[in-house]
Structures are given as structure tokens and as C-alpha cells.
């Protein structure tokens, strides 16, 4: 794997599917929303496959799959989902194995750490607090922190700006095609975890610069030089 001499100083990390297995919380909230509309629950894997592009997209896909569009107003459904998700957020999911050890190792080695997620701040903040992961992170860029969300590169640039580092000195860790697209647009390397919500083809099909079995494996990949993004 190619490397360059500029050291990586910032590690930007996705939340859902990368740090936390939040699918149980999200699927439960989505199916509670469907129940409110008198619709049967969708399979777990179906709803989990919609995670990663923000709540409005997830709710839209759920409504379409359940055959509720255009009868149900999207805004009403999003509000209903948020109400249920506030109750399930951080209650059913769990931190992936190796995440805390990996974050601690990165912090100990001097890397600046930020979470960059499409999850709204009102949901991301309590989830990071409930899981204890907020103690490792200097910065949170949520889905509504700025006008753009991943796969737009601007959230990655914004995170680096808040960390006071050049974007070129960052590396993104995620689990989906959204993360790969954002990193490519920002011109930085991207590592994908082998678990998470990559979709039917799995993470190997998404063209990341490296695949991680665990976040604990990341420090070794960043030492002594940063990963170079694929051409």
C-alpha cells in the first residue's frame, strides 16, 4: 500500500456502523413509526440497509418500501421517527469490539480525533455520551452542523478546520460508500471497517484504501506515514 511522507494528524470517524452498532435502535424506531401508520414491520436487514445517508433519506426509503408513499407526508413521518428514536437511541445498540481500545491508542499517540456523521446532532450527542465515546473525541460534525452532509466533502473539511489541521493531513474511517465518496472528494485516504452497513456487496467492493477488522488495527496503518488515497 502506497504511503507518503506527510504524517497524518487527524482521524475522522463515522458513527453509525463504525463506532456504534446503532442499527437495532434505528430499526426499532423505524418499525414503531410504521406501526403508528398501521403498517407491518420491515425486516431488520432491509431497514439497516438504509442507514448512512441521514434520517430524511432513511424515512423516505422505509415509507417507499412499506408502500406508504405518497399517502404519508414525509415531514410527518420524519417527526414521528425522531420521537421514537429519541426513546431507542443508545438503548439497544452497542459499541463495536475494539473501538474504545482503538480510540485510546490513537489519542495516546497524539492523533486529533473527530466524529463526522450524517446523524443529527440531537441524536449524535446523547449516543456518544451514553456509550462513553465522547471522552475520546475533540470534535463532532453532525448531519445538521453545516448545510452539507456526506458524501459531500465539506463535513470532512469542516472537521479538520475545527481541529486546526489541514484537510490533507486527515484520514477518514467509515463503513459505507458514502464515506468513500466523501473522502475521495476531499482528497484524503479512507479506511473501511469490515463490519458495519456497507450493503450487499460488502466493504471490499467499495474501493477503500484499507479494510479494518477492528479500529485497534488503525494505529499500525498510520505509522510511520499516512495512507495515500487511491489514484
UniProtKB/Swiss-Prot annotation:
Any one Gene Ontology BP term: glycolate biosynthetic process
EC number: 3.1.3.18
Pathway: Organic acid metabolism; glycolate biosynthesis; glycolate from 2-phosphoglycolate: step 1/1
GO CC annotations on file: cytosol
Binding site for Mg(2+): 14, 16, 175
Superkingdom per UniProt: Bacteria
Quaternary structure (record): Homotrimer.
Function: Specifically catalyzes the dephosphorylation of 2-phosphoglycolate. Is involved in the dissimilation of the intracellular 2-phosphoglycolate formed during the DNA repair of 3'-phosphoglycolate ends, a major class of DNA lesions induced by oxidative stress.
Family that this chain belongs to: Belongs to the HAD-like hydrolase superfamily. CbbY/CbbZ/Gph/YieH family.
UniProt name for this protein: Phosphoglycolate phosphatase, chromosomal
